[in-house]
Amino acid sequence: MCIRDSNTSEQYFFDVNEKDPKPKLIKKRQRGILYSVNSWDGKFYNHTNENAEDFKIDISDSLEKPDWKTFIAAKDEVLIGGLTFLKNWIIRSETSDALDKLFVKNITTGIEEELIFSDETVYVPGASLMQRDKNTDEIYISYSSPKTQSRVYSYNLNSKEKKLVKEQEIPSGHNPEDYIVERIDCRSHDGRMVPLTITRHKNTKLDGSAKLLLYGYGSYGSSMNPSFSTTRLSLINRDIIWVTAHIRGGMEKGMKWWKEGKLLNKKNTFED
């Protein structure tokens, strides 16, 4: 059982096999500290921002007298996501520099690998477990990029075989190879580097004659993921270069990126 708001959480546990179970507190709530504990195969995993601004994941054999040890260490300006469990695999996500990444750890070997299933450098991946069978080695991966329409693949974690299951239909037709996507960093007023995602048609001239539309949104921790948009492409097809600035106020570079663009720091959003 979990009680939480935007910056505080408290969680209780009990043994479902007990006749008259009494909820037990895992950790007393503390302002500014978020945590979420999940169990799998006799282990307990704590996704928390305690002493880790962009979160970390600790592991313990017990909740009665927990002895938390590092499972996934905190990283500067890398937002650590939660865990998804299968019988033989642990799947997790990270976000840094306005890019999401997926990692898969083999429980038997202890080896963790990043799931790389495209040669594109700017894209949005996502893993989902649409089946109830936790014994499976197959997951579904959603994928899109500024030039590639939304796709869903089935992916076998053992064989690494990938199959296209569904693709977003574009009635007017669409060829991703007609577009070029680039990522650069731009220095803001205080020296912080702001990621820019640039999308253009391959035939658009870079001689200064093309129009450019600069878009940015940085509020409430909402990240502007580099995903696909038919509306955007209708402009790009008219030789307009589209640039998305991943400015502060979102969480493209972690919690600090958000905090540097809110409240008394809101000016940074507009300066970026």
Q: What is each stretch, according to the model?
A:
Residues 124-272:
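Serine-hydrolase catalytic core recognition
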